[in-house]
Each structure stands twice: as structure tokens, then as C-alpha cells.
């Protein structure tokens, strides 16, 4: 039997949802472990010891300056080189909501001068269920989501709108298959509010790096791991996004270990 992959959950002051992420990883067969940023700076833990990393949501450092920028700066200072080596090795790095903002600020998904996560079009915090649909063939999540319709997901953010400096950036993202998920209504992808809760260009909800192992998304899969957390399900066999998401991540990390 293959060993449970060790998944590190990166934290600092203001992080939340880490407990939900922890138990989602655990219930999907992984071995989760909290990594406070001070553990990295003190040398108590190293990112290279993990098979996967997750940066959860929250309001790191109170979202001062802008969402994710302080966490990104601190993480880059204490473990930037190690994280880039981790990514270059092909290990999965996931950023959820505030974690997505951190990945963008670190330039781990795309050139941060050409794409950003900015204020919602509504200029307010948006918190509700919506839907997402997989629009890429990302190797981590393809078997769980691709071609299987739309999935309910919770969102909760004020700075989640993906904006690009020019349309050619979006074209490049599509060419490289980096648009992983899009916001949807109960039937298919839509730009309409409130299904697209923030006004993201082309309803983009999730992006990856070119290699496909660094993935950021604004929805919170850890908040819909169980069927009872869904608004409703069409059939008794319907699976929810959270379980599929974490099962896929853990399976991918496990398979990489041989």
C-alpha cells in the first residue's frame, strides 16, 4: 500500500479555514501538517519535507496594503527559493482564496505585472454559494471534474476579481491550458452576477502555472466536503466538489511518490 502523502498547510496571523483544510486532507487519505511561517524562519520545518502544500483562505496580516501581499513577502523572504524548487520538482502547491492571492503576489502563476486579483466589481464582500466548471485538462483534477458538469462551491471574498493588463494575457492563459475552473450557474459557465460573484474576466475562478502543479482558486472546496453542506443535490450518487478536490490532490501527491 502506498504511503499517505504529507501535505503541509501554510499559516500566518490572520489565516483561517486551516482546520477545514486539515480535515479535508486527512479524510481524503493524506497526512496533513500545519506549517506556521515562523516554523520556516526558525528552521523547525522545511517545505522540501512535504509532498504537497496548501495556502488556505483568510485575511493574512489583516489584508493590510492589499490581500495576500504581506504573507507573500514574508513567505518569499523565509522560503522563496525552497518554494520555487518545490514547484520546479513538480510537487502540487494549492492556494485557496487568500492563498490564491498569495500565489499571485509571489508570481508563481503568471507575471504579476500583467494579471492581478483586485476588488470585486460590487465593491463589497461577496459570500454565497455559486457553481464552478472545469475548463482545462489539468492533470491533478481532470479525472475528478473534467466533463462532469458544474459543481456547487462556496465563495467568500472582497478581492477576487481576476483582471489582466491586456487581452493577449488571457489568450496566452488559454493557449497554455491555465484556466482551470470558471464560475457557472446551475447549467453552464456564465458571466452573470451573482454566479460570477466578483466580475472576473471571462468568469475565471481558478488559474494554474504553465506546468499545472501550482493552482489558485477563489472558491472554498474545504467548505463543501460533505453532501449535507450542499444546497441540494440532484441524485443520491452526486458527489460534492470538496471531496473530489481533496481526493484528487491527495491521489496525485501519492502517485508521485510511486
UniProtKB/Swiss-Prot annotation:
GO terms for cellular component: cytoplasm. The keyword Ligase applies. Its EC number is 6.3.5.3, 3.5.1.2. Pathway: Purine metabolism; IMP biosynthesis via de novo pathway; 5-amino-1-(5-phospho-D-ribosyl)imidazole from N(2)-formyl-N(1)-(5-phospho-D-ribosyl)glycinamide: step 1/2. GO terms for biological process: 'de novo' IMP biosynthetic process. The keyword Hydrolase applies. The active site is at 97 (nucleophile), 220, 222. This is Phosphoribosylformylglycinamidine synthase subunit PurQ. It comes from Thermoplasma volcanium (strain ATCC 51530 / DSM 4299 / JCM 9571 / NBRC 15438 / GSS1). The lineage of its organism: Archaea, Methanobacteriati, Thermoplasmatota, Thermoplasmata, Thermoplasmatales. The gene is purQ.
